[in-house]
Amino acid sequence: MLLSDRDLAAEIKAGTLALEPFDPALVQPSSIDVRLDKLFRVFNNHLYTHIDPSRQQDDLTSAVEVPDGEPFVLHPGEFVLASTLEVISLGDQLAGRLEGKSSLGRLGLLTHSTAGFIDPGFSGHVTLELSNVANLPIMLWPGMKIGQLCIFRLCSPAEHPYGSAVYGSRYQGQRGPTPSRSWQSWRTWPTR
């Protein structure tokens, strides 16, 4: 069940949903707007001939911190990692979905490629996968609204929420945009 504004307020008051920093003015009818942090990870395309998710490629991205009062310029066709300003923490009976903002989508900004789902028990900054599909550069200002967080209540609490020892939870407590750690639990399954 998708939570409404009054449900979101109740979960925040109960401590089962937390955003830090939190601004009540960002609560919408069925979501909470989240803002862009000033940390980005850009791809070092000149260092690799390809990306292999089964291998550790530490130099694939480099951290960039945007100076106060300056934008990050995302050029057409570029893909970068960024993160929410807010640390988002979900209880074991809540799951989240990060969606883009319609106004930014209409300018050609994609907020996430595939990873918009947030598991119950997660706590940390949410990594954004930003792409510019427009024909002009897009100025990304730290502190601007970048997405909206939708919260869903599970039918029952997760038996093993994110952050528990069962799953490893590679991104629990992440600060800023975190590069892929797919290689840490890489495996393939038979195709026949």
From Swiss-Prot:
Enzyme Commission numbers on file: 3.5.4.30
Assigned protein family: Belongs to the dCTP deaminase family.
Gene from which this protein is expressed: dcd
Keyword Amino-acid biosynthesis applies: no
Pathway membership, UniProt: Pyrimidine metabolism; dUMP biosynthesis; dUMP from dCTP: step 1/1
UniProt cross-references to InterPro entries, sorted A to Z: dCTP_deaminase, dUTPase-like_sf, dUTPase_trimeric
One GO term (biological process): dUMP biosynthetic process
Membrane-spanning intervals of the chain: none
SUPFAM superfamilies: dUTPase-like
UniProt-annotated stretches for the region Disordered: 169-192
Name of one Pfam family that matches: DCD
Residues flagged as site, Important for bifunctional activity: G116, F117
Protein name: dCTP deaminase, dUMP-forming
Source organism: Salinispora tropica (strain ATCC BAA-916 / DSM 44818 / JCM 13857 / NBRC 105044 / CNB-440)
PANTHER family reported for this sequence: DCTP DEAMINASE
Keyword Cytoplasm on entry: no
Annotated active site: E129
GO MF terms held by the record: dCTP deaminase (dUMP-forming) activity; dCTP deaminase activity; nucleotide binding
Ranges of compositional bias, category Polar residues: 171-192
